[in-house]
Amino acid sequence: MRIKKYKTTLSILTIGAAVQPLLSKEPAKHPNILVVMTDQMRADLCRREGFPLNTTPILDSIAQRGCWFDKAYTAAPASVPARTSFLTGRFPKATDVRSNHNLQDAVYLQDMYDIMKKAGYRTALIGKNHTYLKADKVDFWSEYGHTGKIGKDKTTGDAAFDTYLGSLSMYVNYDPSPFGIEQQLPYRMVDEAKDWIKEDNKLPFFLWFSIPEPHTPYQTCEPYYSMFPPDRIPPVHTDMHTLNEKGEIYQHMHDVMLLAHPDFPGKIDRARSVYYGMLRMIDDQVKRLIDHLKEENIYDNTIIIFLSDHGDYVGEYGLIKKGVGLSDVLSRIPMIWYGPGIKANQQASPAHVSIIDIFPTLCEIVGEEIPLGVQGRSLWNLLQGKAYPVEEFESIMGEGGYGGAYYTAKDDTDYEREGCLNIKKGSFDSLNSWTQSGSLRLLRKGEWKLIYDMTGYGELYNMSADPSEVNNLYNDARYNDIKTDLLQHLLKWEIATQDPLPVPRKRYHFKRNPHNYLFAETKYSK
């Protein structure tokens, strides 16, 4: 068993009105694979999900010509656990990576890059890594972080922009960026991707194109800064007054944020405006990348996957960033598949899926065995419009917290000594001992969502009537049957994802469904 570092990227493919409805033709034996991943991108802030602002027209057009999911969930709403799960197809409870600070501890047998190399692909990472993956495992490596490109290979203008990013203390620039679009990270990354794709067309490529935005620091240039003015954006569904209903740990998050930025409540709409502008900037750069695939005549043989590692509050509950809980604004992610063999469907798939399902799906696409220890299910039959067991995808699980007991107001709350607050610099880390304490699980099934923790405390929400998750129905006797059903599904998920690693030496053969289905055809015969 090996331990590696790697980060996942979302593949986005779009061309607006020029994109033709995709026929469900079989892909070539080795289609190119482009995974475009964003960082901290909300799933619901787009028109295909009913949001009134036109933040992602290109992605929306791709989604409606491919297959997209509105019940896709991350494995855990933090970068390193989510990205590690993306690469390995394993939940954080199996990878042992439950925080952003132990990426080197990842446990798995083979990951996405191992399989792509085995299948004959040339591989690349362009963008944010934030996993165990290292450059010597990838054919082409160009790493970016939230303060710019890592390394010295950049122009004077790019270096100046990266210095500017570092000056923002992972917060918000309420003014337009003083730099043009050519210095923005997604633009520079597209330039590098175009060069790498063009240099060799003899082998199929696997590219993890991992955009560091719209993660903080929120910032963008014109015209994106002015595209969604604060006085023309829709109101948030919740605010800081909702914190009393969400619980003490949410209040901790709000307290530490206000210590760093006491003026934030009065500027929340401008922060949201900047975030929406970043979404549109990302969308435009995805189009540049897609246009290049067409120019190189490889668009029709490229499978594109678009996703994010997790979401962001973006003003809900009076917060930004991520940190507390498993609300959908953090845990639900965008997921789009487009390319040869994938059946077009304008409506969202009813299937409940996870970030861990991407790796086994790619294994099946390239004709390689799904490695032992992978806990995700292949979506390939579903994506092709073929028959698949509906019960396999009628619910999905997610995780949160790094363990231990909850910190409360009775405990020491010296945020600066903890290292999660620097008042002088105006910075705060939303992933800290308070917000990450405890262990949580979520279970989504249809319009219902369950959150359950290690103390037995539960939350039950009707997501159709209460998408902001403020009306907890867990202790309402009228919903006992629904609660029991979701608890049974959660228990089933916990048992079915028991980790088979390490492999028992010279003993026992581990039986698996060929698509790695967990629940279909697994019952004992009577």
Region spans (language model):
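Long, internal low-complexity/basic segments
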Residues: 25-31, 38, 42-43, 68, ...
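Active-site-proximal cap/lid insertion segments
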Residues: 27-31, 43-48, 53, 153-187, ...
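Polar, surface-exposed loop/tail segments
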Residues: 56-57, 86, 128, 135-137, ...
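Catalytic-site neighborhoods of secreted/periplasmic enzymes
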Residues: 85-183, 189, 400
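C-terminal, low-complexity/hydrophilic appendages and adjacent surface loops
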Residues: 327-328, 398-475, 524-526
